[in-house]
C-alpha cells in the first residue's frame, strides 16, 4: 500500500517538475558575417555588445561579444545545433577535441575561431596563428 501511495505522490511531482523545465528554442532568423572574421557566420539577430581589440589572453588576436536572445539555453548549457550546422556549412570544421566547457573551436584553412556560447550571448575570438590551446 505504501508503494502505491508513494507512486501516487511522486509521479505527479515528477511530471510537474518536467513540465516546468524551460525549453530551449534556438533563434532562427538567418545569419550574417561576424565583425571578427567575415567568413564566420553569426545569427542575424546578434547585436554587438563589445569589441575586444586587445584581449588579455596572449593566444587571442581579437574578439567581439554579441547579444543573441535565446541562444545557449539556460546558463548557456544548450548547444545551438542548427547554428553549429550553419558554421560547418560555411566551411568551418569543429575541433571537438579542443572544446573547453562553453568554448568551442572552429578551423577554416589557417584561421581558428573560438566561440564562447553563454545564455543570451556569443563571444567570437580569432586565435593567433600557432596558438596554444
Segments from the language model and where they lie:
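Flanking scaffold residues of small Cys/His-coordinated metal-binding clusters
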Residues: 12
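Positively charged n-region of N-terminal signal peptides that target proteins for export
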Residues: 1-4
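Extracytoplasmic electrostatic interaction patches
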Residues: 52-133
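Compositionally biased P/S/T/G-rich terminal and signal peptide-adjacent segments
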Residues: 23-71
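C-terminal motif of bacterial Sec signal peptides marking the signal peptidase cleavage site
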Residues: 15-19
Amino acid at each position: 500500500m505504501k508503494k502505491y501511495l508513494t507512486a501516487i505522490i511522486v509521479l505527479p511531482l515528477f511530471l510537474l517538475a518536467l513540465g516546468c523545465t524551460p525549453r530551449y528554442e534556438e533563434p532562427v532568423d538567418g545569419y550574417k558575417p561576424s565583425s571578427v572574421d567575415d567568413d564566420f557566420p553569426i545569427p542575424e539577430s546578434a547585436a554587438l555588445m563589445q569589441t575586444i581589440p586587445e584581449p588579455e589572453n596572449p593566444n587571442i588576436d581579437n574578439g567581439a561579444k554579441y547579444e543573441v536572445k535565446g541562444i545557449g539555453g539556460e546558463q548557456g548549457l544548450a548547444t545551438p545545433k542548427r547554428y553549429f550546422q550553419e558554421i560547418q556549412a560555411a566551411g568551418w570544421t569543429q575541433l571537438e577535441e579542443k572544446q573547453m566547457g562553453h568554448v568551442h573551436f572552429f578551423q577554416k584553412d589557417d584561421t581558428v575561431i573560438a566561440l564562447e556560447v553563454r545564455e543570451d550571448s556569443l563571444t567570437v575570438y580569432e586565435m593567433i596563428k600557432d596558438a596554444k590551446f
